């Protein structure tokens, strides 16, 4: 029979074989929709949270937190995907979260948070009346959502990561629908707070100050004092619940990426 001779030319022209010829100095070229994860800060000593969504449905699904379907093409683009977070449930969420994030970005850049996001100026002054030692050097500013029972449904970690890249530092819930969603929050460096059922001591767009939150995580506290900040400071209790030592370290580092990097 006639011998079949394979022509590798087409394959060689389309596929790069780096075996034995790899050059680490060459920078990988990414397509326009492939983006790196933004840098994520370690857990600050003190934390100021703005509630940017308040959801009282009995259950909030991961598909409501970040819809599937048309968003799938953005899974390689964390910030692009985050634009769709809560879009079907609370369209105002993304804009509010990004406004708050301006303050944290200013802190990380060594700039004035109150200048970047003037709304926090009076809030910080109220905080300093009781906690005079709070400065930008020991403070993080971010967003949180409240939902009665978030995280039911599919296991998509983007339900948590989209909140993180928009400046989310925490969730507050009466309970979490799945251990998986709570674990995803932890892996993205977000505090999985719970609060007792009943009338909420805060509302959407309120600020919550959590003093010494880093020490609370280090010391394995489960009940964490916090304050709703309006004209004054109203004390509330947030529950952190059980965390393994590794989970605490992940939160302290800022996210699982930082945990492995360090």
What are these regions (language model features)?
Residues 1-2, 6-262:
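Fe-S-dependent hydro-lyases/dehydratases of central metabolism
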